[in-house]
Amino acid sequence: MTTPLTVERLSFTWPNGRPALSHCNLQIPRPGLWMLVGTNGSGKSTLLRLIADLLEPRSGRISAAGKVALVFQNPDHQLLLPSCASDLQLGLQADLSDDERRSRVAESLAQVGLGGFEERPIHTLSGGQKQRLAIAGALASDADLVLLDEPTALLDPDSQNGVLQLLWQLTHQPAAPLTALWITHRLEELQHCDGAALMEHGSMGSWQNGQQLAQRLAPLQGGRAEG
């Protein structure tokens, strides 16, 4: 099986000279839901943006087996058009026929529990529905690796749980399971992943059992890792 993501000795420094990552290594061994926690400034969000090719590393190597999509903490920052269908159209391949485009949009919406929402105005959606739509955008674009930067930080507990369950289903479906790398500041979410790691000072620790890592961090951080 091809390794979905490999990051080797990745370093990044901001224009003001402040280092964000220092020889960071990461390997996701198989499809699944993988999570990162760490304090503010530990480099988590910077790492995702480097993997998504939004930033240029100073040194190191990134190898992703397939297309990469990034889901932001606030879906309003990436949902750009008025309706659900029109927004998903942005990420589709240009050579698809009209019928194929309609089918791809409908399929992606159904996968995230928004079947029949094609003409629904985005401004009428709840926060959880908007985040599901952002995830549908990743699916519509045929992404193999989905990066999620604190996707539940702005959601109520019910919506948080719904998005978490959705990602678990997408990463463990029998046919073509996704690979997801999820940043979280909620330690309880670590109980629902295939592996979790702690980022500190621009470097990443080894993968651990998520529940065990949450239990180890809870006394230090009051049950909540800083975003």
Predicted region positions:
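Conserved ABC ATPase signature
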Residues: 121-125, 129
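Conserved beta-strand-loop-alpha-helix hinge in the C-terminal portion
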Residues: 203-227
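Conserved ABC ATPase "signature" region
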Residues: 99-117
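A short, flexible loop at the N-terminus of ABC-type nucleotide-binding domains that lies
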Residues: 1-7, 11-23
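Catalytic Walker B motif of ABC-type/P-loop ATPase nucleotide-binding domains
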Residues: 146-150
